Curated annotation (Swiss-Prot):
Stated name of the protein: Microfibril-associated glycoprotein 4
Annotated Pfam families: Fibrinogen_C
Organism: Mus musculus (Mouse)
BP GO annotations: cell adhesion; cellular response to UV-B; elastic fiber assembly; regulation of collagen metabolic process; UV protection
Lineage: Eukaryota, Metazoa, Chordata, Craniata, Vertebrata
Glycosylation sites: N89, N139
Assembly, per entry: Homodimer. Can also form higher oligomers. Interacts with FBN1, FBN2 and LOX. Interacts with COL1A1 in a Ca (2+)-dependent manner. Interacts with ELN in a Ca (2+)-dependent manner; this interaction promotes ELN self-assembly.
InterPro entries: Fibrinogen-like_C, Fibrinogen_a/b/g_C_1, Fibrinogen_a/b/g_C_dom, Fibrinogen_C-term_domain
Family annotation (NCBIfam families): GGGWT_bact
Placement of sequence motif Cell attachment site: 28-30
Signal peptide range in chain numbering: 1-22
Length: 257
């Protein structure tokens, strides 16, 4: 099957029909009308409205006039998960600049990044937990959970604050804790270096993340297909597979705590 082109999420919205039109591409038809009427904030709201199948729905973190497509995981551990990062085949490049990571890119029915501003707005309005699901090329799976997740919750301007990550309350699902190291860090891309290292971690790691000096997690790195010779520039989760193994599938998702 031919891969879908990767578009910034905001550009994709501009090309979509009106949000309540049944032909809106990629949105579950049975859920579309009700989600537009209720204007859900996240997948928790959609689940509460009775729509409990995995798929793409519309949420409204900006308010009633700006729908945002998102993938909802309605089955894992009771469902209600709003997926903000999804990778599974390398069809979308994640080596991108600040603007793309701020606004989002890809398609919610494929590989995508929801956008830092969307994440900030969600965590500004509700308390969330984070789950990170991982799979390797031998079909082994593991996850990590954090009972507290937020993005620049106290900032006047989240962007000026660097969309700082806060996580706490690690719970191990076999993956180990590779994210607590990044808590308190600003987000960095190759064109906006906000890490603590003397060099540009995003450029060195071929990705974008809440780098410190540099990382134990690099889930937006190159899709390298398993073991690789280059150091720490694949889809790495160091506490599970180290710095020389690029994962097959990742999902980062949040649910109300």
């Amino acid at each position: 099957m031919k891969a879908l082109p990767a578009l910034p999420l905001m550009l994709m919205l501009l090309s979509m029909p009106p949000p309540c039109a049944p032909q809106a591409s990629g949105i579950r038809g049975d859920a579309l009308e009700k989600s537009c009427l209720q204007q859900p904030l996240d997948c928790d709201d959609i689940y509460a409205q009775g729509y409990q199948e995995d798929g793409v729905y519309l949420i409204y973190p900006y308010g009633p006039s700006v729908p945002v497509p998102v993938f909802c995981d309605m089955t894992t551990e009771g469902g209600k998960w709003t997926v903000f990062q999804k990778r599974f085949n390398g069809s979308v490049s994640f080596f991108r600049g600040w603007s793309d990571y701020k606004l989002g890119f890809g398609r919610a029915d494929g590989e995508y990044w929801l956008g830092l501003q969307n994440l900030h707005l969600l965590t500004l309005k509700q308390k969330y937990e984070l789950r990170v699901d991982l799979e390797d090329f031998e079909n082994n799976t593991a996850y990590a959970k954090y009972i507290d997740f937020s993005i620049s919750p106290n900032a006047i301007s989240a962007e000026e604050d660097g969309y700082t990550l806060y996580v706490a309350g690690f719970e191990d699902g076999g993956a180990g804790d590779s994210l607590s190291y990044h808590s308190g860090q600003k987000f960095s891309t190759f064109d906006r270096d906000q890490d603590l290292f003397v060099q540009n971690c995003a450029a060195l790691s071929s990705g974008a993340f809440w780098f410190r000096s540099c990382h134990f997690a690099n889930l937006n790195g190159f899709y390298l297909g398993g073991s690789h010779l280059s150091y720490a520039n694949g889809i790495n989760w160091a506490q599970w597979k180290g710095f020389y193994y690029s994962l097959k599938r990742t999902e980062m998702k949040i649910r109300r705590a």
